[in-house]
Structures are given as structure tokens and as C-alpha cells.
Regions:
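Residue-level preference for the first positions of well-ordered beta-strands
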Residues: 94-96, 139, 164-170, 198
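A cross-family acyltransferase "interaction/gating" segment
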Residues: 129-131, 179-255, 259-260, 274-275
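A transmembrane-helix-recognition feature enriched in membrane-embedded lipid enzymes
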Residues: 15-87, 132-136, 235
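Catalytic core of membrane glycerolipid acyltransferases/transacylases, capturing the structured
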Residues: 41-52, 56, 62-63, 80, ...
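Generic beta-sheet signal
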Residues: 121, 142, 170, 202-204
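Catalytic-site beta-strand/loop segments enriched in glycine and acidic/polar residues
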Residues: 160-188
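Soluble, non-transmembrane catalytic domains of enzymes that act on hydrophobic metabolites at membranes
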Residues: 1-20, 73-90, 105, 148, ...
Length: 278
């Protein structure tokens, strides 16, 4: 019987504890997954080594090498976390990738699909698992409270574009619960506009094997990051669905382009635009 039919015929709703228990590993497997993940993380940090030099002005070969290494590491970590990826549309290879932001998994997810350079909020550097990898692999951390920091990040993005490396931003400026898309901040779109590079919209959604939205791994608001991580590790399998739209020419001004991209990401995910987090 298909999973959807099994759920529909069940006396319990999809989010009932009975369904969650069937979707979860036991204590022994949970411990083994944590051990395997720790070993993979240690191995990944060793592989990254000294590739943590500033991006601005560095040799293009190092940019490509670091992005490719982050891709390999992300694929290995997602495998240990038992996250499978399903895509729709074409994965971009150049320019700027713009996506909604749901979970600490997003960076691993998108980098597993294409070698790229990320812009993330500074807090990500302190996140378990992905934080140390992001720091070593050259993620650009922005202090969003400092308006002057945008200029520094935009210069680094321009360097990545000059080297032909795909870059990715999360223009909501924060992560959400995934039920909609928050307003896009336009400031980091300027380098793509100046270079007249294509900007590709994308939408991310996480589901359980039963097709239920995996909102327990959405990290937003006052949610505890460790609880979200435990939920991911405890699950037998998580499905990440990434929908890519057609590249958009960056000819408009920043605010207009941000609005166009926001509408397209909403369309890709079939979710509404949200003015604020529910």
C-alpha cells in the first residue's frame, strides 16, 4: 500500500506519535548514527585543512578547489544523516543562487548539488556539524547588524563571480518554518546586478518518508538547535526536495529583483509570501 494511502487509512493523524515512532530509529541505531557522524565530521575537518584563507583576492583555483571539497564533504554528511535529495529543474553552475532558508541542513543540501560559495549569518559559524565545516571551507559570514559589512561581503561575492564560482545567499536574512517565504533583503543582490550574471531562484522543503513536512528540523525563532539536530538524526530517512526555477537576468534594481525572486521562490514551493514569521 502506498505511504499516502496507509496514512489516510490510519486512525491517527500524520503527526501522531505512532507515526513519528515508526519513522524513528531505535536507541542503538541513534547512537551508531551519532558515532558515524562524529567520525565523518573529524575526517572532513582534517580534509579541509588550511583552506580557510579569505576569499577576496585569492587565487581562482583555490576557490574552485574549496567549493568542490565542500561538495564532497556535504554529500558524505548527508549520507550519514540519511538525507536523500530530490530535485526539480536545472541546478545552476554559475551566477547567484537564491533560496528560502529552513534548516541548518540547507548549506549541506545545496552544496551537495553544486560546488558553491555561501553567504550566511555569523551565527552559523557556531552551529554544530556544519559550523566548523562552513568556517574552514570559506563561507562568507555576514554581521547583519553592521550595515558596513554588506560592502565587505559584496566585494567577496564579486571575487567569487570573477573566478566563475557559483555563490548562494539566503535573502530572507533568517531561517523560517518553511510554511511560507519571508521578505527578501535586496542588499546582497548588487554584485550579480553589477556583473549582469543570472540569478537562479530555488525552494527547499524537507519531508519524512510518508510525505509529511519535517518541520521538526526547521530551525527558527526560539527553537533549540540541538533538538532539531536530534530530530534529524533520529529519523530513519529525510527527503529534501529542491525546486530550481529558470535563471533571471539581473538587469533590474535590487528591490525590484528581490521582489521578483521572492514571488518565484513562493511559486516553486507553492507557498505564500509571509510578512513575518507565524
Amino acid at each position: 500500500m502506498p505511504a499516502e494511502s496507509a496514512i489516510a487509512n490510519s486512525p491517527h493523524p500524520p503527526d501522531h506519535p505512532n507515526h513519528r515512532e515508526r519513522d524513528s530509529v531505535g536507541p542503538l541505531e541513534f547512537g551508531l548514527k551519532c558515532t558515524r557522524l562524529s567520525l565523518q565530521l573529524a575526517h572532513s575537518l582534517k580534509r579541509v585543512g588550511d583552506l580557510s584563507a579569505p576569499i577576496t583576492g585569492e587565487h581562482p583555483h583555490l576557490l574552485h578547489r574549496r567549493a568542490a571539497l565542500l561538495q564532497k564533504i556535504s554529500r558524505a554528511l548527508l549520507s550519514h544523516l540519511q538525507v536523500s535529495i530530490e530535485t526539480r529543474g536545472n541546478v545552476p553552475q554559475r551566477g547567484l543562487l537564491v533560496s528560502n532558508h529552513v534548516s541548518f541542513v540547507d548549506i549541506m543540501l545545496l552544496s551537495a548539488l553544486s560546488p558553491l560559495v555561501f553567504v550566511s549569518k555569523s551565527e552559523v559559524a557556531r552551529w554544530p556539524i556544519i559550523g566548523p565545516i562552513a568556517v574552514k571551507s570559506g563561507t562568507l559570514f555576514i554581521e547583519r547588524q553592521k550595515r558596513s559589512d554588506v560592502s565587505r561581503i559584496n566585494r567577496a561575492l564579486s571575487s567569487a563571480f570573477d573566478a566563475g564560482v557559483l555563490a548562494c545567499i539566503f535573502p530572507e536574512g533568517t531561517s523560517s518554518d518553511g510554511t511560507g517565504v519571508l521578505p527578501f533583503q535586496p542588499s546582497l543582490l548588487q554584485p550579480a546586478i553589477s556583473a549582469q550574471l543570472p540569478v537562479c531562484p530555488a525552494h527547499i522543503r524537507y519531508e519524512t518518508e510518508n510525505g509529511i513536512r519535517a518541520d521538526d528540523i526547521a530551525y527558527f525563532g526560539d527553537r533549540n538547535l540541538m533538538d532539531c539536530m536530534r530530530a534529524l538524526i533520529r529519523r530513519k530517512k529525510t527527503i529534501a526536495r529542491v525546486s530550481f526555477g529558470s535563471p533571471i537576468d539581473a538587469h533590474a534594481d535590487r528591490k525590484t529583483l528581490a521582489a521578483i525572486l521572492n514571488r518565484e521562490v513562493c511559486r516553486l514551493g507553492q507557498v505564500p509570501h509571509l510578512e513575518h514569521q507565524p
